[in-house]
Amino acid sequence: MSKLDLNALNELPKVDRVLALAETNAQLETLTAEERVAWALENLPGEYVLSSSFGIQAAVSLHLVNQIRPDIPVILTDTGYLFPETYQFIDELTDKLKLNLKVYRAGESPAWQEARYGKLWEQGVEGIEKYNEINKVEPMNRALKELKAQTWFAGLRREQSGSRAHLPVLAIQRGVFKVLPIIDWDNRTVYQYLQKHGLKYHPLWDQGYLSVGDTHTTRKWEPGMAEEETRFFGLKRECGLHEG
């Protein structure tokens, strides 16, 4: 696999970009997660960043990428509405893995947003999308720009939802390369990795949560529910960071 020209690929229509990356993706599918990270660091341009929501399985990608690229900036978009257990988990993992954590937030505080717009998450899909744009998308775009990112690692997996079922290992999103090293991992592989490296699931895993985001748009899993139904009242799966 040869080095890829980000500027040249960004000039192509989206469909042509996908086709241009198809051969590389076919080869990346045959590699291990660790090999994918190593390949990206050797063949894709820096600066490099890793994003994390510090969700249920976050320790996996944080450990995997950070051990190969120590001190890689780890981007967290903090809405101000995360669970107390999530903030504690962030502190625990940051200390344990010696993460180079970079926290980005909306320009308006949660209280100010509620004063201006009301509780956006109670205003249907349109309200949720506006909430995500303010609290997730804009801060992430700012992070990528300020950190001069050209290659972005994330811990998405196909098994998590229908919207992620066909994602490739390598794509271009928001004008940068996006690498998903554990995209093809199943729950068993995640569990085995955590066990092997002495890592933990998010604290709310033991309370029945399969996916964790903000307190007001996250539900415990109940029999018969798909994982994606535990977020955003089942109206949508993605918070906007991994769309587009």
Swiss-Prot record:
Give the UniProt entry's GO cellular component terms.
Answer: cytoplasm
Output the GO biological process annotations, alphabetical, semicolon-separated. Answer: hydrogen sulfide biosynthetic process; sulfate assimilation, phosphoadenylyl sulfate reduction by phosphoadenylyl-sulfate reductase (thioredoxin)
Question: Which InterPro entries did the record assign?
Answer: PAPS/APS_Rdtase, PAPS_reduct_dom, PAPS_reductase_CysH, Rossmann-like_a/b/a_fold
Q: Name the pathway.
A: Sulfur metabolism; hydrogen sulfide biosynthesis; sulfite from sulfate: step 3/3
Q: What class of enzyme is it?
A: oxidoreductase
**Known catalytic reactions:** [thioredoxin]-disulfide + sulfite + adenosine 3',5'-bisphosphate + 2 H(+) = [thioredoxin]-dithiol + 3'-phosphoadenylyl sulfate
Q: Does the keyword Oxidoreductase apply?
A: yes
Q: Which residues form the active site?
A: C239 (nucleophile)
Q: Which protein family is named in the record?
A: Belongs to the PAPS reductase family. CysH subfamily.
- What is this protein identified as? Phosphoadenosine 5'-phosphosulfate reductase
Gene name linked to the record = cysH
